[in-house]
Amino acid sequence: MREIVHLQTGQCRNQIGAKFWEVVSDEHGIEPDGLYKGNNDLQLERISVYYNEVGANKYVPRAVLVDLEPGTMDSVRSGPLGSLFRPDNFVFGQSGGGNNWAKGHYTEGAELVDAVLDVVRKEAEGTDCLQGFQITHSLGGGTGAGMGTLLISKIREEYPDRMMCTYSVVPSPKVSDTVVEPYNATLSVHQLVENSDETFCIDNEALYDICFRTLKLTTPTYGDLNHLISIVMSGITTCLRFPGQLNSDLRKLAVNMVPFPRLHFFMPGVCPLTARGSQQYRAVTVPELTQQMFDAKNMMAASDPRHGRYLTVAAVFRGKVSMKEVEEQMQNVQNKNSAYFVEWIPNNVLTAQCDIPPRGCKMAVTFLGNSTAIQELFKRVNDQFAAMFKRKAFLHWYTQEGMDEMEFTEAESNMQDLVAEYQQYQDATADEEEGEYEEEPAEEEQ
């Protein structure tokens, strides 16, 4: 089967990762002690994508948990799923990344990276046909951003032909826990542009908005935010884990979603949105789902898709839905809002379907959009970066770990290039491109 090895680096990611395993284990009927207690054969049919079977009916996640300090690991271990993970797969340092990208990427993280790669190798060797890796990390911290990107580039070296998929939590202005987030995020994006195949940008600010507006939670906790992220993660991979009429995998997703190699930053969304622990109170229909799915309020990245155009879109429907109805509705959305889809990629909406709905729903959909509006998110980080970098504020923390100012300048210009590329394709039309191509051969003749 097409296995995926999951890595989680840094504090907040380990909490998200733990939540993700909670959701996936629940869907596959696996108890916190790793024993299968489900009642449906479909749960076991492709369980090997995320789990190793170690004994009769006992399953262990293919997860590697990494942090530069032992604190988070202890909380995962003592949490509800503590005994689910393989003890050898916890890799941690003692010093902490201190929210410093340079520590994670060059000094502390570099010392730990070989130990992590050994565990990753062991997991990869235990697979029949490895499909790729997924990494959860935040771009604002030291471990998740610095060490996360270091791991990505090392794994890339060793497994160049495997998919590399990242769930990256982008820092947001309203929900910030450190001053140097813009530095860490810019340095990380610089790495992700080169080394990742698909990056799902998740934004704390957007998640808070969803909790306030849609779920009507007055005081959302990180638990609520992590719950939303884990739903997206489980939604993206359902096609791999369960049978369906139109299956998709990470590579098919990338082929359909990435028109230009650098532009692989997606906005995820999910509907219907329900709070943790609450059931759905009414049935949803396919037209409602498609309507909600494209709603800006459902996006988990804080940029408004109406400010840009969609290059490509993928929608993964779950539950017993009629594919004919889905196709009609998707076509309908495209026809009505054709201005928001680039016309030079016809049929740029991919739909996949999986028969098994998430717990407590009849049907649901996970949305992925490759929209040029995501540049807003990078612009925002870049402006904050520029303001601090102009005065060289906080720079000594990075230079004393051996970094050079040059690296900051490079990362900044790479991010600005990325924004410019998105803008270029947002403005491009089918006609003007043709005109350009027609002129070129004429010049050669002279």
UniProtKB/Swiss-Prot annotation:
Pfam families in the cross-refs: Tubulin (PF00091), Tubulin_C (PF03953)
Record-level Gene Ontology MF annotations: GTP binding; GTPase activity; metal ion binding; structural constituent of cytoskeleton
Compartments where found: Cytoplasm, Cytoskeleton
PROSITE patterns recorded: TUBULIN, TUBULIN_B_AUTOREG
Cellular component terms (Gene Ontology): cytoplasm; microtubule
Acidic residues bias locations: 429-446
PANTHER family for the chain: TUBULIN (PTHR11588)
Assigned protein family: Belongs to the tubulin family.
Function: Tubulin is the major constituent of microtubules, a cylinder consisting of laterally associated linear protofilaments composed of alpha- and beta-tubulin heterodimers. Microtubules grow by the addition of GTP-tubulin dimers to the microtubule end, where a stabilizing cap forms. Below the cap, tubulin dimers are in GDP-bound state, owing to GTPase activity of alpha-tubulin.
Quaternary structure and partners: Dimer of alpha and beta chains. A typical microtubule is a hollow water-filled tube with an outer diameter of 25 nm and an inner diameter of 15 nM. Alpha-beta heterodimers associate head-to-tail to form protofilaments running lengthwise along the microtubule wall with the beta-tubulin subunit facing the microtubule plus end conferring a structural polarity. Microtubules usually have 13 protofilaments but different protofilament numbers can be found in some organisms and specialized cells.
Name of this protein: Tubulin beta chain
Organism: Pleurotus sajor-caju
